[in-house]
Amino acid sequence: PSHYAYVKIAEGCNRKCAYCAIPIITGKHVSRPMEDILREVEGLVHKGVKEFQIIAQELTFYGVDLYGKQCIAELVDRMAKIEGVEWIRLHYAYPNNFPVDLLEVIRRNQNVCKYLDIALQHISDHVLSNMLRHTTKEETISLIKKIREDVPEITLRTTLMVGFPGETQADFDELIDFVKWAKFDRMGAFAYSEEEGTYAAINYEDDVPKNVKQSRLDRVMKVQEGIMTELNFQKEGKVFKTIIDRREGDYYVGRTEADSPEVDCEVLIPHSEGALNIGDFYQVEIVSADTFDLYGTVVEQSA
């Protein structure tokens, strides 16, 4: 759809997580100059784009190579001041050395979605160490608490990996307990598979049996589905600013601030309610919910 766009602010990654081939494929992190990005956003606004998905393999490193410091907060703050930018959404932050000044920018700017996609991968110190993640359970939990303290309404999305070489049942149980505690709004999970040329492929034996990986993946997703269902039910009766993406069958399909295109929940609004404009914002009351979808009715069109 022409009302949202993906804006890549950097290419490559300097981190060397054991399982990941991205640095091998894309090379070192290279930030785009800030003025270039802002010009691109202004150009897209003129073409009718309202929502901007800001993407990079590693957002939080943005600017270090160009300006000698983390500049993601400054970039987002400047982007938010561009007239016509309705929503800015951030994808793929890294927990280690997270720039906490970004939280203030998210909190302060109405048009920066209270949404953060931060891939944590695991919580067991043993697995995090084997993954070369350079962070700990304690640091991860502190960061989640800090994010939620500073931006109470934030939607947190994460990605987890099960079955990494050396993952024991105790490690996995720790991960499940963490998922239950953290109650992530959105989560993707994967079973480890070896990527050629990576540190893990060269140095570790892929020793968690395939069936164990699958059962762990099923288990973590089942726990998460329960959490998402509960969180979605809590939205019933509340009103959310919603962007309309498309018409499908008997429904208009939209998303709230808490939902990124193609990966998160959607809001279904019966088109018997009347014509809605694709790409426009409406205030929508959620009348019912299930694990992956919300069902709503339009209260008013947003300015």
Regions found by a protein language model. Name each.
Residues 2-35:
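Canonical Radical SAM [4Fe-4S] cluster-binding loop centered on the CxxxCxxC motif
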Residues 191-196, 232-233:
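AMP-binding (ANL) adenylation modules
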Residues 200-303:
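Terminal RNA-binding accessory module
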Residues 63-85, 130-131, 194-226:
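Radical SAM enzyme [4Fe-4S]-AdoMet core and its adjacent flexible, acidic
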Residues 46-172, 180-181:
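Conserved SAM/AdoMet-binding glycine-rich loop
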Residues 17, 37, 54, 90, ...:
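Conserved, mostly hydrophobic/aromatic
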Residues 24-53:
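Conserved alpha-helical substructure of the radical SAM core
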